[in-house]
Amino acid sequence: MTIPDPANIIHNDAGTASPHHIWADVGDSTSSSQHEATRSRSDDANGGASASMHAPQHVKANRAAQPTYDSSDLPSFGLSARLTRDSSSFGSKPSSSASDSRRPKFAPYEAENLWATSSTTSHPSKASQSTLSPNASVFKPSRSLQPNHFEPHAVANVHDFDDPLNSAYSSDTVSPRPDHAPLDHEQPQQPSALDPVAVSKVEEQRGDHSIPHQNGLVSAQAQTASDAVSTSKYTTEAADQEEDQDDFVYPGADSPSSGQAAVQDEQQAVTDSQTTKSLTKQESDPEASSTSLSAPAEAEHIVVGSAAEQSLTSSAPAETAVHIDYDTLAQLCSRGPLSDLQSFFHTAQESGLSMFSLSNDPNPGNGLVPLHFAAKDGKTDIVRWLITQAGAIVEMEDREGETALHKAAMAGKLSVASLLLSHGADANAQDADGWTALHNACSRGYLDLVRLLVDRGHAQIDVQGGRGAWTPLMNAASKGHLPVVRHLTAKYHADPFVRNAAGETAFDVAAATFEVYICEILERYEAERWNASKFTTSSPSRSGAIVPGRGPYEPLALHTTIPVILHENQRLDTRLQTLALNGGKPRWSSSSAARAHKPDRRSPSSMPPGPLAPSRTRHVPMRQDDVGLPTRSLPYKLRLRSRVGPAAARRRAAALAAQHTPNPQDCHDDDLASTPTPESVLQARRGTSSVNGASAQHADAESSHFWLCEWQLDTTHPLVDVEHGWQYAQSFDALDDKWSSQPPPPLERLLEGRGLSASVTRAITGGAGFANAQAEQEISSSSWVRRRRWIRVLRRRLDIEFGDDLEACEGATGAGAEHLVLSSESQSNGDGSHGLSTAAIMAAQEAAKSECSQLGPDADYVSRAKALAGPSAASGATPADAMGADRDELARRIARLVMANTELRAAFEDDDVERRSRAEELRKEYALQLGQLREAAGLDEDEDEDAADDDDDEFIYPNSYKDDGASVFTRLVNGETSGTLSRPSLSQRQSSAASMLRNSVAPSEAGTSLAAARSADLAANREFRVPTNEAPNKVVLRHGPTMREQNLQPQWQRDEEAKDCIGCGRHFTFFLRKHHCRRCGRIFCDACSSKRAQLRMAELVVDPSLPSMAASEVLAPTRVCNGCHAELQLPPQLQNMRGADAMMAASRSRGADEVSGRSILETQLEDGAFRSTLAPPSDVSSRASELTECPVCSTTLSALGGSEEQEAHVRNCLENGGGGSMQGGRYLVYKLPEDSPIVGKECSICMEDFVANSTIARLPCLCYFHRGCIDSWFKRGRECPVHARDW
């Protein structure tokens, strides 16, 4: 009967073929070449391909040189030939055990190996029944047991080789170690499976005396095969799961199953020896082949069981593997010395561990290798030995993905970083979060490491790392490392406009951490980059991207977080009076900083020049309260209130009056300008309405930013005192590098009271006793100033869309036209000496561009600059010949020189040294000619004169607010020149007109296009209306001021809304009180509202919370502001109606509007005279002006009878006190009723409110005071505290 092949029954070779396409020739005999054509079944399962075709050449040679028979003169089979992993074409992983055994990673056929070991009997032993055998780890094909595989004629192919995935871990292979004497922990050689004595002894040890019958072999095999299939699935899944969990074991790490693997390897050697001898004997006796098929299986089964039992006794000696003390290794690498570390490595090497495995073995606690420990602690000799001798990998990463270079850069180890770079470390390697070594060095401020990484390691400067996409410049700026920031910007030209994931630049992150001085450095660097990138063709890549050179540099448009800086200025006061009061020592004084006779006088609080300041060339007086947040309508401009001195205000008011007055004879002198007149009120009325409207608009405007902090001292500047923030110098005009953080020795002597003889002598003699230069030098040495910086940081609101991509590109016009195109209003109002012809400028630009285009595209920037300048600016020429030319010629030459200077800016990026030198010389020559031409045109003189006026007059003097602010001119000019309410200057008006058209006009190479500038001129002309395609208006509009809808009823201004006096601009304090004008309802100081006027009930404006206040205010003259008092002096038909009169006039105007279709409220200015179409106001209704109760006793007047009786009662109460008593005929004293209209009003003496049932004194002038206050007052005089009148 033919025995069925179990391989064909339960195994499908084609379906379960290895993905590596490598199969082992399990029955490969190399005895004869006559059976070479016969292939093993393993080759058939592989589609006829032999595994040897994939073998390396050295494996093929070894296989060809192997002997046909072994030492026992028996054929050698592939089952007994083991191929180590070192010889495999797949490579190998270093093992942690001395026996070099590892748990298999590829074992898809364990089940058939199990079937082969358990097929000898239907009643397997307990050892093979309880669980999988330790040796059943890899499938050994079952067809190795078939007769055709054991025929002596089976010939192996010379190209065959053992599969490393099977043979290396097969339980039927021998140990790869060469023949040698048994080691101490090895078991002695097991007896052969065919030795009956040995077999019987083994069976007796097992306790199993049943011998399987031969004829039951096939049935037992078939029965066991089905169980093996299901078991193989479980075993395969378990092996795959273990492979996922332990995919890679670092070299040198102890495996938990290392002892078991060593035992398995020894048992495999014993089992293979027994099986080989049994199979050899069976082949040598063909007649007994039919009766001894079960012999090998039995022998193998017996040996497996005995090996399992022997594992208990052999496991103890196998667990003597080398244990690595990782803590000691880390300490030796971190602290050394090198000799101890070398001894540690030699000891481990003698125990079976290689130096390569130990040097690259990570610490199980933190994942660091020895190279990481040595690098972060700066052990250069250990790092060098680990790399060159121990074989440490330079690019080995830890759990965070950091290399040794990351560790050295973070710790600042320069020598280690240099050594790593010399051995091939990558300076641009990123860790798991994207940080590079340059990020680490910049974050810690190691300038030497930054230079090393960039110069030698070629690290990328603008690389973005981390989850926030930060650049190295951002890391250095946010941590305040000034030297690194300077080096990255000055030498390596880092891009300051790169944004991180939050849309912030390096400037923003520095401002957010209050590194203000670094913000100043970055601001200057950004401005230089911005100006150097003008007129480029780059376009924004995405919304919100920064395009340098597009328009003016505006920090508020480019950044989200910006600091505002103010200077507190003081001067050393060495006057004789101060020395006498201060014990002979000088003192610092803020008021002395603004002395008029000092050439470097400075306001006590000023804003330095910059992009955010009103001026870019000089310090502007500015208090902390004067700085406001930008509004949503103007998000890129700070709201700043500029302070103007009284003298400058009067001069500017006179100049403004001269512009509006056609004849100079009608102008008033400066001394009369301080007194309000009806004419001044009429001239300023239009300006008052516009200023008030703008003030209300900005007061209610929503801010686009918010403050991150309050005002605080800045100590980030390297030249300031770290404790108090002061800087010391001998003049406020000293350069920044001339200031010192500590008082110099001469200043210290002065502060101690020494070296003041010159100051005292000068004070006594008036300066007449100084004749030599030494005395003058001594006097100058006593002049010292100091300042400190106050900062406040504002940040953009996140809930507002700004559209930076459009706003930043708003000013896309050239800088040349911005300096040249002047408002046509100044040309029309003046004599033509304050501006140049725009038409001439535009014509010159067109001609210059035409000449430049003829040079062709290959011309360099020097040639183009010469062509733009024209022949009039040839080398050696001077503009002296243009002094007598007309202004159009001057405008043309100036325009061409500006274009030439703009073209020469390309020299900043030119690498040609010679050409850059010629461009620099040419630029200096053109700048000289341009200055002379501008001087000839009279452009610089006006600007210098304005600057001189501002320097002389625009200062704040403490306790110097002596001007009563009565001048309407002064008040209105103050309002126009304060903050955002000021009328823009000439250049600002030009810029505003140009910015309205910039979005629709493409930028030109040399400046603003001709159409844009012409449109700006036309838009500035009041008489010009741009024609459109819409239908023409049927109604001809009048020429005159545009009327705006406004509330005709004056409103009572709340106290919390007023911080400064509207008249003089002084800040309200405890000593400077607030006063309401009863006619306009606005708040003024006492000096600006000292006038009294008798108002009608319809004109009164009272507090809405105290409606009964009108009854007391109408009886006597009440407080009005100086402007309302001046307006009341006008004829009735020219006065502005207030209160009820205005409401009734509005009602009449609406009725007239229905009839005539024209508003009766329209006004106009013709020939300089004001004419109003308002009708004379009618008398106030008696019902509205009647008193309902007595103001003294609060008696209802309607119950007293007619008007005569009411007037008599009020007169009697006023004269006799209405139940009160007149103290000595001077004032009336009475108890204040609860319903009195003056309850809640303020006593002018103690500033406390009147309370019901308190004792009140009323003077004959109807002024009310507390009884105790007026008694104390009259002890010092006999004048009313309000009216200063004797009683």
UniProtKB/Swiss-Prot annotation:
MF terms in GO: transferase activity; zinc ion binding
Family the UniProt entry places it in: Belongs to the UPA1 PAM2 domain-binding protein family.
SMART domains documented for this protein: ANK, FYVE, RING
GO cellular component, one term: endosome
FYVE-type zinc-finger residues: 1055-1129
Compositionally biased residues, Acidic residues: 938-955
Record Gene3D superfamilies: Ankyrin repeat-containing domain, Zinc/RING finger domain, C3HC4 (zinc finger)
PANTHER family: ANKYRIN REPEAT DOMAIN-CONTAINING PROTEIN 39, ANKYRIN REPEAT DOMAIN-CONTAINING PROTEIN 39-RELATED
Pfam annotation, one family: zf-RING_2
Stated name of the protein: FYVE zinc finger domain protein UPA1
Consequence of gene disruption: Causes defects in hyphal growth and secretion of chitinase CTS1, 2 cellular processes that are regulated by RRM4-mediated endosomal mRNA transport.
Upper classification of the organism: Eukaryota, Fungi, Dikarya, Basidiomycota, Ustilaginomycotina
Organism of provenance: Mycosarcoma maydis
Intervals of motif PAM2L 1: 239-253
Annotated ANK repeat ranges: 366-395, 400-429, 433-463, 468-497
Compartments where located: Cytoplasm, Cytoskeleton; Endosome
Zn-finger (RING-type) residues: 1243-1283
Chain spans, region Disordered: 1-298, 582-630, 643-697, 934-960, 977-1005
Keyword Cytoplasm: yes
Residue sites binding Zn(2+) 1 per the record: 1061, 1064, 1085, 1088
Record's keyword terms, sorted: ANK repeat, Cytoplasm, Cytoskeleton, Endosome, Metal-binding, mRNA transport, Repeat, Transferase, Transport, Ubl conjugation pathway, Zinc, Zinc-finger
UniProt cross-references to InterPro entries, sorted A to Z: Ankyrin_rpt, Ankyrin_rpt-contain_sf, Znf_FYVE, Znf_FYVE-rel, Znf_FYVE_PHD, Znf_RING, Znf_RING/FYVE/PHD
Low complexity bias: start-end ranges: 86-99, 981-995
